[in-house]
Amino acid sequence: MARRGKKKGRAVSGWLVLDKPAGLGSTEAVSKVKWLFGAQKAGHAGTLDPLASGMLPIALGEATKTVPYVMEGAKVYRFTVAWGEERSTDDLEGPVTKSCDKVPVEEDIRALLPRYTGLIMQTPPQFSAVKIGGERAYDLAREGEVVEIAAREVEIGRLDLISIPEPKKAVFEVECGKGTYVRSLARDMGRDLGCFGHVADLRRTEVYPFETQQLVPLKDLEGAAADAETESDRFSALDSYLLDTEAALDGLPEIVLGDDAAGRIRLGNPVIVRGRDAPVQAPEAWASLRGRLIAIGMVEAGMFKPKRVFGL
């Protein structure tokens, strides 16, 4: 019987709130971080376009089990729309497909914003990761295929006009839910204003529950790794940038366990929830032992039932 090979890398776990530089793809960024930390596992919580900069939460080790909770969180973007041109990629990267000399005025732009707030239908860009017949839309688009992508419902909490730095450019900030494409937003606003438009600059500033002040530039990680004299020093310096795995679970009730209950949970068994403030019912909650995440599960009739156990 073949033996399972030993996993390569360190069993390091936690969240890194990376400030991704423009020009680097999300998958490349994850690979870079995984290599720097020598981690066994790594994954991100929501693709950020290569031309975009900003917040890319990256999960290491056991934290990858909490990625879905961050994926569902609200996101905030600051972006610049260049009016007068529509491009194949809906950003600066693609060739111009339509153009117009009209320049929208501030009054018309502001009047348009309520139309893009709340639940709206949005069609993803041709160059997107949406799957069409089992293939990514961007792969089909690169082959010259124009594909029909179905519109989908997305939620926009707010869309604000921040400034108009020059007549043909406007800066916006949007808070939106999962699946929203800022490039589609720019394209659609341009069409509604009768002047076309594309994203000229894009930065993600927040991914709930993480905050701007938690951002770590890639160059800081590379500098910390380069300055370390030993591998031990390197990993110690890098690990100081990590947030605890449970940082992704903000908003879920915490069930505080003792040693005996934690032992039962680790074996996949339910336990009675104790404590004056403990919930009797909760569709999702996380259990902790001395502040460390043990499991995610549900509380039903005063019992915590684990769904996912962590090896932290």
Swiss-Prot record:
Coiled coil: none annotated. The active site is at residue 49. Keywords: Isomerase, tRNA processing. Transmembrane segments: none annotated. InterPro entries: PsdUridine_synth_cat_dom_sf (IPR020103), PsdUridine_synth_N (IPR002501), tRNA_psdUridine_synth_TruB (IPR014780), TruB_C (IPR032819). The keyword Ion transport does not apply. Its EC number is 5.4.99.25. GO terms for biological process: mRNA pseudouridine synthesis; tRNA pseudouridine synthesis. It catalyses: uridine(55) in tRNA = pseudouridine(55) in tRNA. The keyword Isomerase applies. GO terms for molecular function: RNA binding; tRNA pseudouridine(55) synthase activity. SUPFAM superfamilies: Pseudouridine synthase. HAMAP family: TruB_bact. Belongs to the pseudouridine synthase TruB family. Type 1 subfamily. Responsible for synthesis of pseudouridine from uracil-55 in the psi GC loop of transfer RNAs. PANTHER family: PSEUDOURIDYLATE SYNTHASE TRUB1, TRNA-PSEUDOURIDINE SYNTHASE. NCBIfam families: TruB. This is tRNA pseudouridine synthase B. The gene is truB.
